[in-house]
Design a protein with these regions (language model features):
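Terminal, non-catalytic protein-protein interaction segments that mediate quaternary/complex assembly
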Residues: 1-225
């Protein structure tokens, strides 16, 4: 399986070959489709902004569906995704913890505790109505994450936790950095909770990513040069 350095080199190669995908608005992108890799680093092309990541996770923890509740300055990208009132769909904390979205985190834990060999331990982020919800009230927010699939694999004294992320779309400059740090946060939480409930050690693994469209926008091509 590829790692983040492999992904970086694949993106650079496409850029050098001028293998572009052009959006409806005429913006060039470099895009990898249906790509699978190990998240051995928390960035691909540009180091993360940990101050912002901390604030975004705090907002996810709040489960607020309004971008103006993000601590500090609300990033322009979130303002662009939101409707006229600042409301969005993609608060990932709301998507995995809220009862309104099916208590995804709790259900995932329940499956793993009740049957460590289960294939049903998923956290479903998006929903069928996203086709309509994405643009309701002038939003531009079609959730980028489909779901997370977790497995417990036996070790000598307990289990290891495999955590696989399935993405519809991911920007390689900011999106991957922010998303993988969110998933690392949730992963550590799961390891602790599973260890307590199963009363055995839970070993960690590197997160695995499956992305339908992993891309770099034209305004960020300098990171490929």
């Amino acid at each position: 399986m590829y790692n983040t350095e492999d992904i970086k080199q694949l993106l650079i190669e496409k850029y050098k070959n001028q293998d572009f995908r052009v959006t409806k608005s005429g913006v060039k992108t470099v895009e990898l489709q249906n790509v699978q890799f190990i998240a051995d680093k928390d960035y691909i092309l540009r180091e993360p902004n940990y101050d912002y990541i901390k604030r975004e996770i705090e907002w996810y923890e709040s489960q607020s569906l309004n971008v103006y509740d993000i601590p500090g300055e609300t990033p322009a990208i979130w303002k662009a995704c939101a409707d006229v009132n600042g409301d969005i769909n993609s608060n990932y904390g709301w998507m995995i913890w809220s009862k309104e979205n099916g208590s995804q985190y709790n259900n995932c834990i329940w499956h793993l505790v009740n049957d460590p060999a289960t294939r049903n331990a998923v956290m479903i982020y998006t929903r069928p109505s996203m086709h309509v919800d994405a643009t309701s009230n002038h939003k531009h927010d079609f959730c980028c994450t489909h779901y997370v699939h977790c497995f417990l694999n036996p070790t000598d004294d307990g289990y290891s936790l495999k955590y696989i992320v399935y993405q519809r779309s991911q920007d390689s400059i900011f999106g991957y950095n922010n998303d993988i740090n969110w998933h690392l946060y949730v992963y550590k939480m799961m390891v602790k909770e599973l260890s307590e409930k199963l009363k055995c050690p839970i070993k960690t693994e590197l997160i695995e990513c499956n992305v339908g469209s992993l891309h770099v926008y034209e305004r960020h091509f300098k990171f490929l040069e």
